[in-house]
């Protein structure tokens, strides 16, 4: 599936899953989980914002690494979040999970993916993904970033196989690939 269809795929899946019984306007929130580096992240976030800003407010969740390496100021300007959560908010998970209607992971890493599918949920982002799946919230994940290490795809067939298996597992848990 071409990654250029990211936004339209999310919209179609969200519309289908949420249906027409959801509250309209500013009552709905999207948590965007930022996880590691991604050269296309700002473009992806701009597309997400332009498609969802009329119906949703945005909440940002940063992984430990992302909070230190991405341009948070630029991301905040793009999404205009009403809340921003970081690793320190791990202990507020029970309250955080109530604040959003759906989760979008535009740049999940293989580390986080592996943690969630192996039930090793020891970080804020792995916990928020796990809790969203556990409570049957819509979870949309772009797997492009987890297929790369230091911006390069592997030629090792077994590593590709292991990554594909983890992607299949999280999809079986309820996530939707975008």
Identify the role of each PLM range:
Residues 1-124, 129-178:
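A cross-family phosphate/adenosyl-ligand binding-site feature
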């Amino acid at each position: 599936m071409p990654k250029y269809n990211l936004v339209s795929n999310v919209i179609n899946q969200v519309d289908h899953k949420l249906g027409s019984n959801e509250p309209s306007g500013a009552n709905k929130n999207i948590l965007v989980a930022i996880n590691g580096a991604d050269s296309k992240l700002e473009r992806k976030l701009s597309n997400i914002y332009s498609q969802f800003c009329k119906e949703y407010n945005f909440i940002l969740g940063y992984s430990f690494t992302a909070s230190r390496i991405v341009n948070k100021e630029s991301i905040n300007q793009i999404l205009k979040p009403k809340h921003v959560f970081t690793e320190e908010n791990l202990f507020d998970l029970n309250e955080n999970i109530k604040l959003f209607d759906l989760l979008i992971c535009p740049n999940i890493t293989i580390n986080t993916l592996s943690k969630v599918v192996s039930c090793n949920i020891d970080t804020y982002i792995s916990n928020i993904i796990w809790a969203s799946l556990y409570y049957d919230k819509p979870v949309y994940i772009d797997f492009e970033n987890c297929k790369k290490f230091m911006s390069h795809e592997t030629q090792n067939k077994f590593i590709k196989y292991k990554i594909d298996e983890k992607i299949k597992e999280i999809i079986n848990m309820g996530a939707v690939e975008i």
